[in-house]
């Protein structure tokens, strides 16, 4: 029998054309929005840390598009109508960028939490990341049988900074069998963990990533909870000079990436799969 190429009914072709045309129109609108609003015409200048750290940027090379914030930056740039070769990177310190005044970037990505105090000096975009709460523990606790399940976590010895929301969150998310041991600050919490006095503690994921890599010997992030289960979680925004007219264009791009699920997919890849931190349901 002769091979016959399957064909699409006319209504499918028409519908597909509408979808593609709509997507193209959205991209064109975003590009029109950004026109004349960047530091350098036709170029999007993005700042990151010096150096930039895993898993936000891999190998301190944001131009590789590898790492959560590097990938988000290029996704936002594309949604705003910029090609990869129209993106340029500069470096700043964390504190330097928060200060009021003129900036040498269009926006800065360094895990900046959106706060009312900071918004008095700079502008923030809509959030591109809502921080999940994560369980920090040690290799010894894992070897002793601690697992990323609610049943296992209930039996752990927990520690917490008495001055933070970690205590009510522990009660709400896990309801441990024993009351957590309370400390004056997170330094004391991590010291107690290293001394073997507690099995685990609850931190936002960015803090847990830092503590496991730099502070706690043999530190392990056992798992993370869905961000929507956290009360008033930290939200990261792109930092911009106060009054930057590009903000509306950036916000439109982030809204599009949120609605299409692209931001969630980037988060899943770089903050779950690559880090190996499972989600505790």
Identify the function of each model-found stretch:
Residues 70-80, 141, 156-157, 164, ...:
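Extended ligand-binding regions for polar small-molecule ligands
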Residues 74, 86-152, 227-229:
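Acidic, polar ligand-binding/catalytic clefts
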Residues 95-99, 112-121, 171-172, 199-232:
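A ligand-binding cleft/hinge motif common to bilobed small-molecule-binding domains
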Residues 51-53, 63-79, 113, 134-188, ...:
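Bilobed "Venus flytrap"/periplasmic-binding protein-like clamshell domains
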Residues 29-111, 120:
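Extracytoplasmic small-molecule ligand-binding "clamshell" domains
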Residues 82-84, 102-110, 156, 194-203, ...:
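Alpha-to-beta junction loops
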Residues 50, 130-136, 205-206, 213-254, ...:
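Periplasmic-binding protein-like
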Residues 28-29, 86, 165-181, 252-281:
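Ligand-binding clefts/hinges and TM-proximal coupling segments of bilobed small-molecule sensing domains
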């Amino acid at each position: 029998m002769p091979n016959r190429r399957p064909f699409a009914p006319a209504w499918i072709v028409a519908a597909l054309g509408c979808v593609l045309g709509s997507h193209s129109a959205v991209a064109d609108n975003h590009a029109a929005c950004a026109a004349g609003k960047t530091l350098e015409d036709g170029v999007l200048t993005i700042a990151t840390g010096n150096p930039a750290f895993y898993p936000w940027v891999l190998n301190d090379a944001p131009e590789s598009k590898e790492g959560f914030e590097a990938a988000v930056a290029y996704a936002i740039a594309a949604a705003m109508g910029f090609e990869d070769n129209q993106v340029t990177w500069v470096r700043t310190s964390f504190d330097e960028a928060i200060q009021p005044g003129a900036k040498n970037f269009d926006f800065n990505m360094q895990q900046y939490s959106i706060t009312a105090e900071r918004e008095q000096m700079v502008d923030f975009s809509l959030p591109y990341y809502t921080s999940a709460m994560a369980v920090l523990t040690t290799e010894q606790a894992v070897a002793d049988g601690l697992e990323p399940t609610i049943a296992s976590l209930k039996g752990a010895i927990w520690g917490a900074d008495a001055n933070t929301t970690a205590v009510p969150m522990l009660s709400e998310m896990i309801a441990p069998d024993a009351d957590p041991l309370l400390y004056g600050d997170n330094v004391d919490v991590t010291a107690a963990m290293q001394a073997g006095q507690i099995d685990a503690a609850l931190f936002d994921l960015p803090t847990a990533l830092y503590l496991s890599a730099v502070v706690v010997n043999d530190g392990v992030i056992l798992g993370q909870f869905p961000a929507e289960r956290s009360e008033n979680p930290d939200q990261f925004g792109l930092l911009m000079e106060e009054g930057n007219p590009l903000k509306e264009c950036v916000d439109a791009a982030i809204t599009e990436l949120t609605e299409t699920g692209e931001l969630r997919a980037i988060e899943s890849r770089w903050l779950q799969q690559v880090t190996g931190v499972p989600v505790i349901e």
